[in-house]
Structure formats: C-alpha cells, structure tokens
Amino acid sequence: MNSLLTDQIPYQETNSSMIQKLSTPPFNKWITALALGIVSSATVNADSIPTTILDPNLQVTTLLNTGLSQPMGIVFLGSNDFLVLEKASGQVKRVINGVIQPTPVLDLAVNSASERGLLSMALHPNFPATPEIFIRWTESSTGADSNVVSEVPLLGNRVDRYLWNPANGGSLVLDRNLIKLRALQTDNIAVAGHPGSSNANLQGNHNGGVLKFGPDKNLYLFMGDQGRRGWLQNLPNGPFLKAPLVDDTFGGPSPDNNHLSGVILRLDTDGNALSDNPFFATGAAIGGEVGTNIQKIYSYGHRNGFGMAFDPASGSLWETENADDAFSELNRVIPGMNGGWIQFAGPLSRLPQFKLIETTQFTNAMQQVRYPPTRVAYTPTLAKLRLFSLPGSLYVDPEFSWKYEIGPAGTAFVEGNALGSEYNGTLWMGSSRGFAQVGGNGGSLYRFHLTPDRLHVDVSADPRLADKVADNLFRATKFDGTESETLQIGTGFGTTPDIQQGPDGNLYVVSVTDNAIYRISRKP
C-alpha cells in the first residue's frame, strides 16, 4: 500500500496558455478513487465499525462474510442465486441460497494492481433466453494473477462476452472480445522533447470500469481516464506547451486505441458503435481509428468512477465520479455530455475553490505531474472556454457534489415497494473510506430522492444543500460526511463498489473491504 502513497517531485509551472486545468496533481493521493486500490494482493480485514442502517423500519443482514476475497459485484441468475466476481483472484463464483459453490464458474488471469482486476459484469437483457454475460476485467501479461503494476498489456482492459452453461453447477465460456482499452500507464518514461514527464510513477489507477445495460438494451461502459491528458480530458493539444503535441509515449492526444479513456461508451452486444450515438456522424467525418472510437462515445470529460445506474422511471443514466481531492460528483448523464474534467470538477461556479484546494492543501502530486493544478483556469468563464467541444457536446453541472472527496461508489435505483413505498424511485449510493481514516463513518450509504420530473436530485428537505454541494470538512483525511447527514441511510459498510436490487426487491450491497455482501430489507 505504501507504494500507492509515494510522494512525487514537485512540478515547476511553466507558462499556461490554452491548456487548462485540473490537473494531475494529487491525482490520487492515497488512492482515493474508492479506496479501491485496496491492497490488491492481500485480504482486507472486516471493518470494526458496526454495519448499521439508519431507518428503524429497515434491517441489514450479513449474507456472506466468509469465503470471498475482494468481491466487486454481483448479478442475479434467479431468486437466491447469483454470481459474484473477485477483484484479485480473477474468479467468478456462484452463490446459491447463501452458499458459495465449490467450483468457480470462471477463473481469469488478472492484474489487480491498484484499481485493476476483475471489475464488473452484466447479464444480457434477454438472459437466460440469450445466455450471454459480459465481463470487464484487466488481464495479466504473465498468464497468471499478478499485482505487479507493470505486468499488464498496453491495452489490457477488456470487455468480453461469455456464454453461460448451466450444466454441472454452471460455467462461463469465452465467446468474443468486444473491446480492449488502455491499461499500462508509462508516464515514468520521458516523452521525447518533454523530459519533465519522467518523474511520474507507474500507475494502475483511474481504471474504473462499470458495465450496465440500458433500457435500450445496449451496453454502457464507464472507463476511467487512465491518467491520460488529451482530447477526452479537454486538452486538445495534450498536456505539453510545445511540440510535439502528444499525450504520452504512445501518441495522442486524439483518442486512438491507446487514448480512449475518461468516457462512457455505448455499444451493441458485439462491441460496435450505435448509429444514434451522439458523435457518430462526427466520427465518420474524422475517419480512421480515431473516428471509429469517437463514434462509440456517449459522454466524455470524466475522471474515474465505479457507479452507474439507470432510472427505471425515466430511463436516464446516473453515474458517480471520484474526485482527486476536491468535488466528488453524482451526475445525470445526457447523450453528448462533457463532464468538464480536467478543466474543473464539481459545479463550474466553484472553480476558484477547486483550484485553491488542489494547489494549496495537497502538495504531493502523485501522478500526471506534467499537468499540475497551477494550470487550472482562474475563472469559470475561462475554464469553460477551454473545454474540448465535439459537435453537439454539452457541459452540464453535477446533480450533486461534495467539497472534499468521499469516494462515491456503487449505485442502484429502488423499484417497487419491498423496502416501503417511501423508497420507491430513490437512488442509493455507496462510498469509500480512506486508508488513513480512524473512526468516522466507515463507508456510508446515501439515499437520494429525485424531483417529480426525475431530472434532478431533490434536496428541498435540507436548506444547507440548496446549492447541491455538501460542504464537508477535511479532518486529517478526506471521506467526511458533514452536510450529508440527511442523505445518509447507512454506515459501516466499507468500500462498496456495487449495489444491486435482487428479485425479491431487497438491496444487496457488495463491500470489497469487508469481503462481505449485505442485504437490506424491510423489517417484518
């Protein structure tokens, strides 16, 4: 874990011109992004903070807390029957009536350094009639499980389609690869003509990967920015101030295969772009590898995230986004959205506060020192002008933000009245806790009501949140819940990369730090 906290050589700011913002800096510090860097090779002990649900009408039950190692997500095959994937073992296990079956249904050779590993899976919308399961994972270049940050192919993040065979306890058989994305972050190697980039550590973070099928029966994939600094991070000329205007040693800044990151992609079940994607025509006009990739983009300007959910009432896509140090986000994603990263995070109006926090409060940039926070614009107007605008793109403020990072994580909408009618249509969100945290809430669950038109978070019950920002505090570390008290519905869940509603209408919360799966249900 200490290697994830390594300090870096401070960057000396040169001129900034049209390049911008948010930088690189404490890019991840103690790997805030969900604390998901969870020591990839070790089992994390269960949290000593009690797991508690705050509504007396609800109860939380520990469904599993033995036999799992770093669980990342689940999918339900039926009532009391689900698959669970493990981050570092590369195994997909079947659980029937609360019992882990003796033989994994799949075992992949994964690289689990930092935020890599076996990360997400999704059932085909017509499952089991169409017996396909889609898996997002990071492969090891060694042919065996590895937590060594360098032991990964350049395009080591994969989405693969597997066929489910229910015979003999079940198994998954590879059908085809849909897409391969950047995994190797080599910014410790100097770019020709730009020796200042040589003091960055090899990284495996910003590897967030979530798979979800939308109501349109198409596949949505969140891919973290991988520390890239190009078009899709709102740097049209890349991070450098003079030629060659590239992103890194593998090219860029345009989104070739090595630089397709910080995006939500919308694909059919074969991995192809949809003709009604927002930038399909633009990509066709550009042509080539870059144009083909642009055709797949649903939204861009994202940093890193581990939560996506579709509102069953409206069909809208919501996602969580991790901050560096300032301004975690909850977003409603519209087609063609530009999330603003790296020009800013949080509401555009809070840009001065964002820049102040990033440049003064956290001094040890961990990654991407070639684009530090000192280069963030000084005014919201200038920051917005610096956005890289694909035709038809639109910047939209987050629906909710936290001043300091809380590590927002898995999300799920509640559909129906199994938890009580008051919860029907609510959005639940998990969170993280920092490695340095002692005490605290130990990983909260948050519950959001939406406005009647389902377009916004309804914060009318708490006047402090009228600006849709929780001005939480920094108390020796981040992950503080101040001003979120009225949103908080649970504590002590650890880091929760996945929340799913089961066939019974209850919520199932996956805790990667507690090695546990919790069930939230209505009391009898």
Predicted regions and their residues:
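Bacterial N-terminal signal peptides
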Residues: 31-41
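Beta-propeller domain segments
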Residues: 48-53, 116-118, 128, 140-141, ...
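Short, Gly/Ser/Thr-enriched beta-strand-loop segments that form substrate-interacting elements
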Residues: 487-492
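Sec/Tat signal peptide C-region and signal peptidase I cleavage site
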Residues: 42-46
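Acidic, Gly/Ser/Thr-rich repeat motifs that build Ca2+-stabilized beta-propeller blades
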Residues: 47-231, 235, 307-310, 315-323, ...
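Bacterial N-terminal signal peptides that target proteins for export
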Residues: 11-31
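Leucine-biased recognition of intrinsically disordered, low-complexity hydrophobic segments
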Residues: 4-5, 22
